[in-house]
Amino acid sequence: MKRHEAREKALQALFQIDVGHIPPDEAIGNVTGSGEVDPFLRQLVFDVIEHRAEIDELLRSNLEKWKLERVANVDRVILRMATYEMKYVDDVPVSVSLDEAVELAKKFGDWKSGSFVNGVLSKVKAALQK
């Protein structure tokens, strides 16, 4: 599985976990069906959950005129995934994480999601580079 596809599946699984409050393994199973689970997909899902408090704090400090809880569910999950990658995944360039997040937002969010995600993550990127 390519990383782009793993990100899409991780987004779908994390969305189910966030909105449906289901266990991570069940959510991963729902999006992958039976068979082997991609290690990057598993890493994204479990590590975003593990680091959620730090990720959310970083997002809150970079949202202007928004509360994280009011951000659309899909956008919030995308922001969490990308922030996790930008902060914790050394083998993925920050620009790739940001670009992938914008593409996911365009595909799964509404018509404003791409620019919203880009704006927030650009601020997160700047904050991480300090």
Curated annotation (Swiss-Prot):
Q: Name one GO molecular function term.
A: RNA binding
Its GO biological process terms? Answer: DNA-templated transcription termination; transcription antitermination
Give the UniProt keywords, A-Z: RNA-binding, Transcription, Transcription antitermination, Transcription regulation
The record's SUPFAM superfamilies line, in alphabetical order, gives:
NusB-like
> Which InterPro entries has this protein been placed in?
NusB-like_sf (IPR035926), NusB_fam (IPR011605), NusB_RsmB_TIM44 (IPR006027)
What are the record's GO terms for cellular component?
Answer: cytosol
Listed Pfam families = NusB
On the tree of life, the source organism's domain of life is Bacteria
Instruction: Relate the protein's function as given in its record.
Output: Involved in transcription antitermination. Required for transcription of ribosomal RNA (rRNA) genes. Binds specifically to the boxA antiterminator sequence of the ribosomal RNA (rrn) operons.
Family, according to the entry, reads as follows: Belongs to the NusB family.
The record's section on NCBIfam families has: nusB
According to UniProt, the name of this protein is: Transcription antitermination protein NusB
**Source organism of the structure:** Geobacillus thermodenitrificans (strain NG80-2)
**Gene designation:** nusB
